[in-house]
Amino acid sequence: MDKDSQGLLDSSLMASGTASRSEDEESLAGQKRASSQALGTIPKRRSSSRFIKRKKFDDELVESSLAKSSTRVKGAGGVESGRCSGSEPSSSEKKKVSKAPSTPVPPSPAPTPGLTKRVKKSKQPLQVTKDLGRWKPADDLLLINAVLQTNDLTSVHLGVKFSCRFTLREVQERWYALLYDPVISKLACQAMRQLHPEAIAAIQSKALFSKAEEQLLSKVGSSSQPTLETFQDLLHTHPDAFYLARTAKALQAHWQLMKQYYLLEDQTVQPLPKGDQVLNFSDAEDLIDDSKLKDMRDEVLEHELTVADRRQKREIRQLEQELHKWQVLVDSITGMGSPDFDNQTLAVLRGRMVRYLMRSREITLGRATKDNQIDVDLSLEGPAWKISRKQGVIKLKNNGDFFIANEGRRPIYIDGRPVLCGSKWRLSNNSVVEIASLRFVFLINQDLIALIRAEAAKITPQ
């Protein structure tokens, strides 16, 4: 009886112990859930901060970058999607999490390394090709030679004339890119190697003078008259100091420039007086009083100018009225007066020596021979060996217009216009006819031609 009662007591104690343990575990699990809900995140597994370097393959690189970017994206509830897909934490991890402080820590947004790598890779080609269009190979060669000569980028910016107007910052950036950027320096070297040797020689001739070169040139006296041989001897004496592309002529030109600016050793610059103030153009322009520049009206002067203008116009009018009277006197002395046309003369071809009268409606021009008789023998005026036997024909039409037709080899010039063989041209009063260096003036009897036109007008309606 005692044994049975003792066994029942033991079994009841064990059952109560197991029940109490299950209740303790449930209460502990409830506390853990409450703490995790208060934090808003599932506790992370503690891992070592030591990084183990391991070679990654291409597929791993792509998948890891995608996995990292996906694990950084959080849902609206604040739970990471990568963590939700994993396995549940063990009991030992739960115990460690329960000991952690309950204060929530706000997560700090950190950029993903995969995205930053892609941004850097996309920016690099833009920086490489940024200045490839503006900086020519000739500019790079000029920049390199000038920096090697002066070792001063400010002097290079002021003294070198590039193909574009670069700022000092752009010159500095280009020089640093040529030094430290392997991509840009490689492209620039390839472009410079493709330059023509003549272009390279022209660029090298524009290299700036170094301080050592100018110091040697300054020793040549300003009072002396150095020749090209003097500078050639200077080149042979100091071959290491001068640039390889220097010539005696280039040294002479630079020496003359230094002499002009008083940079030689035996030249002294006169100091300015201390009391005097040097004004530039803008300062002098500001000192000018604009009110004094206005023209002051002088009534007496204006009256005199008006009277003089009226007097000159009266004299000009009188001379114009007397012009035809003086023309008659001049023509009577020189014998070049206008001819007196008779009733039978239609026109006159007047030369320097002879006058040819046109009394028929059609006349021929040329050079007369024994076998060829023509109306107007041009050999009477001057040398006519270049004129054809039958050079041309002048005709009068019913409407009163004169036309000349060229039938010779050489052209006939009417007022400077050539009339070729087989062509014709209208002659007007005072037209200049030039045939093989012989010049004539064609004069028309206007009165007789007017009568002919009137008769033609009467006949036309009938």
From Swiss-Prot:
Biased composition, class Pro residues, residue ranges: 103-112
Location of Phosphothreonine modifications: T103
Record InterPro entries: FHA_dom, MCRS1, MCRS_N, SMAD_FHA_dom_sf
Subcellular localization: Nucleus; Nucleus, Nucleolus; Cytoplasm; Cytoplasm, Cytoskeleton, Microtubule organizing center, Centrosome
Residues with the Phosphoserine modification: S22, S102, S108, S282
Residues carrying N6-acetyllysine: K123, K130
Coiled coil: 301-335
Domains: entry comment: The N-terminal region is required for nuclear localization while the C-terminal region encompassing the FHA domain is required for centrosomal localization.
Protein name: Microspherule protein 1
Originating species: Mus musculus
Origin organism lineage: Eukaryota, Metazoa, Chordata, Craniata, Vertebrata
